[in-house]
Amino acid sequence: MRVDFLKILFALTLTIAGIAPAMAEEPGVHRFATYNIRYVNANNGDTGDKLWANRRTAVTNIVKDYDFDIVGFQEVTGNNKDSQTGKSQLQDLIDMLPAYDNYAVEREGKNYSYNAIFYKKSKYTVVDKGMWYINEHPSTPGLSWKYFGDANTIARTLEWILFRDNASQTEFYFACTHMNYSLASSGVYGAELNARMLRELVGETPVVLVGDFNMHRSHEDTYRNYMSQFYDAALHTTTTCNPKGNITHTGSNWYPATNANCSGSEFDYQFYDNIVPLSREIITEDYNRAIAPSDHFPVLVRYKFQDTPSPTSYQVTNTDELLVAVAKATMNDTIYLAQGEYELDATIQPTVSLTFVGGYDKQFSDVVGVSKLRQKEAKQVFNIPQYYSLTLYNLHLENGSSTSALGGGLLAINGSKLNLYNCRFSNSQSTTNAGALYANTHDTYIENCVFDNDTAKTSGGAIYAETMESLTIIDSKFHHNGCTTGAALYVNGGRVLNIQCNGFYDNISNKQGALTIVADQYSAAAHLVNNSFLNNQLIAKKGLATATKDFGGAGLYAKMNNDTQLFNIAHCSFIGNHTVFAGTKANFGGGALRIAQGKSCMMNNLLLANAEKASDTEYEYVDYTIANAETLWRNTENLLSSSESIADWENDLVNTIAGLWNGKVFTADVRENGTYVLKSKMLNGFNLCYLTTNHRLCESAFGFDIDGDGNKSNYLKYDQIHNTRAIKACVGALEYKEGATSITEVQPQDGIQQVDEHQYILTGAPNVTVYNLAGQCVLSSNNETIDLSPLPSGLYIVNQHKIIR
């Protein structure tokens, strides 16, 4: 056998020098790295061994010695040539890494600073490539959200390549970015843009995103954007230092990893999806130079293209089995719970993303009800760390409590995504925020849930939602909750708020509505469709009213970030909400709703018998206080109270409306209070008939851009209980379903009349005609009187009438 002594001698030489020669990698493994190599900066203190001329060999040797298949470089200078070599960093990398080809994009069009992807040209074929700028207009060079005052004057980009692995023919994406170091605004918005656009680009194709992200994992809003779409390799592999040191940060501060002065942040990440990470290494090689080759260490992750492990499922019938399943569960597993009650004396704290599905029969063959998770102690039921997601189906969480600064009496999540379906959160409390649910997530989705009898001290009697991207709440009920601000729901932030087909009733706040929305994002938009706000109260505490003018809106209070942000309200009912304030009346506004700031548009809403009063005065009609009212009400169709509809005392405000509709106009769950006295009142008949006959309540003219893609869609086809609306729809959250098609004879002066079990006689001019609210003629007479008692209880349009008993 022939022995190659030169190769042995070379390997021994490397070992003696402290350099580990690259070992042959197993087949099918791909070695991907990220490396910020520090730009040429001789004018600002980079001298001696920090000069690029004195470290370029170490930088490129790391790439070769540690056998990087693909590496994403950051801070690669193009036109700023080293004074000793006469070359730019980019040219040196090209010359010194001949086995690699590259895709390098300059960030500002000035040949100054690049993100550069270098890849082994023998191992991969480029199928496609591209880039975008990290700003409000990704196809155009420019600074990222600079008008937010970021201390940053460098444009940021993301570069991507669609590769084909020559051995397996597998296609995958590799992307590289260098994020803004100002996290106050553009870091957050840039992260959202990168994560969203990269997901749209790659779909379900394997992808690895590397770079210097200038963030810690504790920077929740920024980090959560990436975690909402991808996985962090550091959390799903074991990290080692190669060849020396015991550090977790990736910044070096120029010191070797074994030096006590070696310090820095973990700014360098690899995010991935649909590919399996095998190991992660912080490459601490310095070639015995007593100085690191850059102020960042490169990070290497070994990947393999293989099927990701299938999630495991668990079936539990009691509390002990539930806790064991949570302890055993791995990423994206599902735990199925049999119907029944599970008493807890500790908080469930998963360290992975999980789904819980309750309500199964004993054979786990079908969902037959719900599973109740009840706290015996004054603790939360769930607490989810910032990295993970949670999905709940068919659960009733009850009797929780929180004293933490964030709150969340039953559930607190600082994670990526929260999804709730057919769940109930009840009888919980918090000494701070969020009596039931604290949701600090990238996305939150709530459907067909109930939040009742939950209280908090500060904000969000039931929910405090602090979403980065989207908050969607559909078909849910909020009742008998209480808090200073946002008696039922307090929303802080969110790019898209979509609140449809919900009921907010009998909630009590002390400052701002049952629903309070404070949207602090630059591009936020809020859409409220088919919601009912009934009998909510704002009872101000003494002393509060003189401190600020941000009071009012017992049903809804909203304040967008600026006057250009959209706030759309359509087919909503605001009825019987009222405000009692102490102190200066000018500090309050709106018995039903107050929109303090935003570009508002309202269409086809019902605002009736809402009022406000000082503690020592009578109620007076105030349905709303809205900024920019002239623009708001132009060419819209909303039915407001008239002076005749104002009750003389508090109970009449609610009793009148509750009696009129007897629950039918809202939701089946809104129960009539036994103390209500059914009354008959004429409610602004001129407006109602005028709208019905002339404006036709055209839903087609009012669309929403729910997902923020710039395309408006019509979300008014269905009413609050998902019945298809007639072409000539009724105002408010629910449409009457008497089956008629048109109104042809009703005149603008006609009124709306309640008929109940009492016998009412109408008298007036001859030819009295009675219509239901869908426009069908149900009674007519050539006489001056007509007996309404044969009609079912309900609302009717009657022309030329007076009322007698």
PLM segments and residue spans:
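Structured beta-strand-rich core segments of catalytic domains in phosphoester-bond hydrolases
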Residues: 76-171, 283
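N-terminal extracellular ligand-recognition/capping segment immediately after the signal peptide
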Residues: 319-323, 332-355, 359-362
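Predominantly extracellular beta-rich ligand-binding scaffolds that present long acidic/polar faces
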Residues: 351, 419, 446, 455, ...
